[in-house]
Amino acid sequence: KLVMDFEEEKSSPSLPYAVEKYSELLKSDALLIFDGPQHESDLPTLNFGNRGISSITLKTYGPIVPQHSGHFGNYAPNPVFRMSNILSSMKEENGIVKIKGYYDGIQITDEVMQYLDDVPDNEKIMRDKMQFKIPESVGSTYQESLQFPSLNVRGIKAGWVGSEARTIIPSELSCLILRTST
């Protein structure tokens, strides 16, 4: 049996219905998931476990309707600055999550660290391909960092940008945060 999920990056909206509808047909003894990028060495890899996901939408509010910043700037609260303060309180500059208990239960044994260290990652090549210099410091290596839950801002929506830009204080900001965990 083979199930292909082409909506995985948008939370698989059709999958629950398909699983319920075809539950008898999908019964099996095991589940094997093929996910993740091909390793840069082109060598085959095998991962034990996948990251799960949970998400939350945060909202901050300013005036009940958008206001002209020339008339109400420095008076009407801007929800963008409120959210930026909230978000910056969640992570250190080096990427480590500051939320109490966020990493509770994560233990990497010496044996597991040895396995992780044996993966032939060339992190300089990886960073060059993605065009950034300094990685976050949650783990000492790429492989170690994958063993910890991540905190990601998936999207922010507020105000106007591009050809619609205005000198307006927006009335609200919506931010979708997700946590992936092992």
Residue ranges and their predicted role:
Residues 1-134, 140-149:
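Fold-level recognition of mixed alpha/beta catalytic cores in primary-metabolism enzymes, strongest
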Residues 75-76, 163-171:
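Short, solvent-exposed beta-strand/turn "edge" segments of beta-rich domains on protein surfaces
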Residues 173-180:
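Short, hydrophobic beta-strand segments
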Residues 55-60, 155, 166-168, 179:
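Short beta-strand elements
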Residues 141-167:
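A structural supersecondary motif
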Residues 5-7, 156, 180:
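Short strand-loop junctions, especially beta-strand C-caps/beta-turns
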Residues 26-27, 171-173:
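Short, proline-enriched alpha-helix->beta-strand connector loops that line the catalytic pocket
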Residues 37-39, 63-65, 158-161, 180-182:
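Short, glycine-/Ser/Thr-/acidic-enriched flexible segments
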